[in-house]
Curated annotation (Swiss-Prot):
Any Pfam family: Lipocalin
Alphabetical UniProt keywords: Acetylation, Cytoplasm, Lipid-binding, Transport
The protein, known as: Fatty acid-binding protein, intestinal
Localization per record: Cytoplasm
Binding residue positions for tetradecanoate: W83, R107
Residues that bear N-acetylalanine: A2
Originating organism: Bos taurus (Bovine)
Binding-site residues for hexadecanoate, renumbered to this chain: W83, R107
Top-rank taxon: Eukaryota
Main location: cytoplasm
Protein task: FABPs are thought to play a role in the intracellular transport of long-chain fatty acids and their acyl-CoA esters. FABP2 is probably involved in triglyceride-rich lipoprotein synthesis. Binds saturated long-chain fatty acids with a high affinity, but binds with a lower affinity to unsaturated long-chain fatty acids. FABP2 may also help maintain energy homeostasis by functioning as a lipid sensor.
Length: 132
């Protein structure tokens, strides 16, 4: 699968505005913008393993397409939702457990880069990753 491999964040677009909308304080926003996030993604059939490491934490997330699971963001925000494969895109539809608001994420490969697009309350941000 095209998502398999080690991906290191290269740049962000509108990420601070997105985090502000999410309610993340200014200090955490400044730190998160330079978190050196690395994702190691492996896929076996419908099962994905994502090893996420950054300045803040290292975790392993295992999920199956179409199966709801709970997940915590680096700032502690709790989410519940599922990933689906829509064409060549991984589409995540999540809800915050604290307020019920939707947080949607799309991962796609564009020009050899993995583009992760977040949408929350009308604010869209992108994190662009290069394959290592």
């Amino acid at each position: 699968m095209a998502f398999d491999g080690t991906w290191k964040v290269d740049r962000n677009e509108n990420y601070e505005k997105f985090m502000e909308k999410m309610g993340i304080n200014v200090v955490k926003r400044k730190l998160a913008a330079h978190d050196n996030l690395k994702l190691i993604i492996t896929q076996e059939g419908n099962k994905f393993t994502v090893k996420e490491s950054s300045t803040f934490r290292s975790i392993e997330i295992i999920f199956e397409l179409g199966v709801t699971f709970n997940y915590s963001l680096a700032d502690g925000t709790e989410l519940s939702g599922a990933w689906a494969l829509e064409g060549d895109k991984l589409v995540g539809k999540f809800k915050r457990l604290d307020n019920g608001n939707a947080l949607n994420t799309v991962r796609e490969i564009i020009g050899g880069e993995m583009v992760q697009t977040y949408t929350y309350e009308g604010v869209e941000a992108k994190r662009i990753f290069k394959k290592e």
